[in-house]
């Protein structure tokens, strides 16, 4: 399963299941779609545990976490 698929599955099935049927495109803003700071932390833990990529805390910034596309790019840069 690709990083994109893993992220989408986790976001839609675990973190924000109510958004699953009307989920925006991968370049849409995750915070506008309902992601909050608690869910973001859960997502970053998921990336470390399940995708096996450690994302440095000092690199967390709005442009890296604003969309599925941005997250995939950031994760792939640390593989």
PLM feature spans:
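Thiotemplate assembly-line natural product biosynthesis machinery
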Residues: 1-21, 73-79
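A diffuse structural propensity rather than consistent per-protein peaks
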Residues: 3, 25-26, 61, 67
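Residue-level recognition of oxygen-bearing side chains
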Residues: 6, 29, 46, 70
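Phosphopantetheine carrier-protein modules
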Residues: 15-33, 52-59
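Catalytic nucleophile serine of serine hydrolases
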Residues: 37
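Phosphopantetheinylated carrier protein domains
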Residues: 41-64
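Short, cationic-aromatic polyanion-contact patches
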Residues: 66-73
């Amino acid at each position: 399963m690709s990083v994109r698929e893993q992220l989408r599955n986790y976001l839609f099935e675990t973190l924000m299941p109510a958004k699953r049927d009307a989920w925006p495109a991968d370049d849409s803003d995750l915070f506008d779609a309902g992601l909050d700071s608690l869910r973001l932390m859960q997502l970053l833990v998921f990336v470390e545990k399940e995708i096996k990529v450690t994302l440095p805390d000092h690199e967390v910034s709005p442009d890296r976490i604003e969309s599925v596309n941005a997250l995939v790019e950031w994760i792939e840069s640390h593989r």
